[in-house]
Amino acid sequence: MKCVDAKFGDRLLDEMLDRTGVRLSDVAGCESAKEALEEAVILPVMNPKLFSGLRQPVKGILLFGPPGNGKTLLAKAVASESNQVFFNISAASLTSKWVGDAEKTIRSLFQIARNAQPAIIFIDEIDSILCDRSEKDTEVSRRMKTEFLIQFDGATSNPDDRILVIGATNRPYDLDDAVLRRFPKRILLDLPDESARFTLLKTTLVKHNMYEGLDDYDLRRIAQQTEGYSNSDLVALCKEAAMVPVRSIDRKKLASCDESKLRNLRVCSSIKNVANFSERAMC
């Protein structure tokens, strides 16, 4: 690893995905966010000469909104469709209790990204490490924020560096103002609307061969009743519903039961409490 401290580089390489294999079509809903990311990241890769001057792509994108709505999945999809190396970095991987280690880790991260470019550095829960500065900040925290800004500026100011930093947060207003300025492109990933909820429910059930016995009318009723649910909530509900037929099997027969023998899911006649969606709606 060129110009990288092996102590920190080896750990960061574990979080590098050469190709994610995720496509934008794998993400249900989030249409406006997908269009914005395609315009900001994928199209410039297809024709770099066209995207110059005022059309030059940004080097920092902030994905924000309620948790569980596909921020990480979207970032992986963008990396895959633009053929860029993807670094999936958590806040914990950048912090350290030892003075100086956090700064060295950040320097190593950006250097590895330079060596592997074009690259996308995705930092989940970025607010936990780059929150607004206050008197309560420790010396380690202040130094880490400063180092991140230095490395970020270095990567974005050098025209030869093809590094994109994508941050994800549920609390954008907690971010330091200096950090926000470095993410000029800000994309909201809100809770899915009724149409997106229907699409996600159907896609999930069809993918796992569990749609037989249901119809679009059934799922549209459920989509209407699940307002306020996130993408991950809906997937969790499908998983819970998938367990309902298993619970009806006699325990003595469970070990020899074949999946093809399980009864299909069905929608019950009344939906009184969507909080218990799997048991009351699909069962």
What is each model feature region?
Residues 15-223, 229, 241:
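Walker A/P-loop NTP-binding motif of AAA+ ATPase domains
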Residues 1-2, 10, 71, 124, ...:
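Residue-level marker of intrinsically disordered, low-complexity segments enriched
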Residues 14-25, 221-236, 246-283:
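C-terminal engagement/docking regions of AAA+ P-loop ATPases
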Residues 1-20:
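Interdomain "pre-motor" coupling segment immediately N-terminal to P-loop NTPase/helicase cores
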